[in-house]
């Protein structure tokens, strides 16, 4: 068991690790996002689309060179944590994440995006009531922590929708719901977007799953072959809309479509859509019990 002084040192160390990682992902896109954007850029045939993709890559390089966020909207910080029950700082992790966000806000710097409901006052720290939002997944007997950080920008959050369908609407209803939302709303979400689809029983379970879907590496597939096929068919169909980069038409509309699902009630089909913009700022950090860590999402970037 750690002494109090050793535990405080460990808390300070992990806070610094998470703060540095959070600041870094505001500046640098994850490897899979950069690779996908390059693929779409190389495949683009419209002159306007080519100009926009060139501007995106110029923007990404300037963000690195100047060590500044790649987009001025650095979002509301969310954490999706998969942590072992024997991780030595499990009890302190919630407060560590909050402190890390406040430190990253100064280091990056991050735009102040936490406004208290009803009071309508910006806290100026990117923390507040229920913020940063943390979703927990406790792994029995594990001693690692896998921390996924997501910056939920305003533009890419606005298209988010959730609905409960009648079972008679079937998977055709799911497809219709996805197309209605992306075709009408994604144009203002800084496309090409990454589309997350959650399918479950209720609006809240589907919504959480849709958000988790956009945290997966681009191009990863659902383990169920039928779901994986639907991911590909949705991606192909949405790209035919020709929304293009920044909504100004082009060959592609989306970077990908990911589906996450849970068993549903026989009488309902809950479906939700979440989107990530082209500057999809998310990162995955694995921290071991001895506080050594692995940067899983940005292997080309050192902390």
Curated annotation (Swiss-Prot):
GO terms for molecular function: 4 iron, 4 sulfur cluster binding; L(+)-tartrate dehydratase activity; metal ion binding. Its cofactor is iron-sulfur cluster. The keyword ATP-binding does not apply. Keywords: 4Fe-4S, Iron, Iron-sulfur, Lyase, Metal-binding. It catalyses: (2R,3R)-tartrate = oxaloacetate + H2O. It comes from the Bacteria. Iron-sulfur cluster binds at residues 71, 190, 277. It holds the Pfam family Fumerase. InterPro entries: Class-I_Fumarase/Tartrate_DH, Fe-S_hydro-lyase_TtdA-typ_cat. The keyword Chaperone does not apply. Its EC number is 4.2.1.32. Belongs to the class-I fumarase family. This is L(+)-tartrate dehydratase subunit alpha. It comes from Escherichia coli O6:H1 (strain CFT073 / ATCC 700928 / UPEC). The lineage of its organism: Bacteria, Pseudomonadati, Pseudomonadota, Gammaproteobacteria, Enterobacterales. The gene is ttdA.
């Amino acid at each position: 068991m750690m002494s109090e002084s050793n535990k405080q040192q460990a808390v300070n160390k992990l806070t610094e690790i998470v703060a540095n990682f959070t600041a870094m992902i505001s500046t640098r896109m994850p490897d899979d996002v950069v690779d996908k954007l390059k693929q779409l850029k190389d495949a683009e045939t419209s002159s306007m689309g080519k100009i926009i993709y060139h501007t995106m890559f110029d923007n990404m390089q300037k963000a690195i060179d100047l060590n500044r966020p790649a987009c001025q909207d650095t979002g509301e910080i969310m954490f999706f944590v998969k942590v072992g029950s024997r991780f030595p700082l499990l009890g302190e992790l919630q407060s560590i994440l909050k402190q890390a966000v406040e430190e990253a806000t100064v280091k990056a710097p991050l735009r102040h995006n936490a406004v208290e409901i009803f009071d309508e006052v910006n806290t100026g720290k990117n923390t507040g009531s229920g913020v940063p939002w943390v979703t927990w997944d406790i792994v029995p007997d594990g001693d690692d922590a896998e921390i996924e950080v997501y910056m939920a920008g305003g533009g890419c959050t606005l298209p988010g929708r959730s609905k409960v369908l009648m079972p008679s609407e079937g998977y055709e209803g799911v497809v219709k719901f996805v197309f209605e939302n992306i075709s009408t709303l994604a144009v203002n979400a800084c496309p090409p977007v990454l589309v997350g689809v959650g399918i479950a029983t209720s609006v809240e379970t589907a919504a959480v799953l849709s958000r988790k879907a956009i945290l997966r590496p681009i191009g990863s597939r659902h383990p169920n072959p039928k779901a994986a096929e639907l991911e590909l068919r949705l991606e192909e169909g949405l790209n035919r809309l020709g929304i293009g980069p920044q909504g100004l038409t082009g060959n592609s509309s989306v970077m990908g479509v990911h589906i996450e699902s849970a068993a549903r009630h026989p009488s309902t089909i809950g479906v939700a859509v979440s989107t990530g913009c082209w500057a999809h700022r998310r990162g995955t950090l694995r921290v071991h019990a001895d506080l050594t860590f692995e940067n899983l999402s940005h292997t080309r970037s050192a902390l």
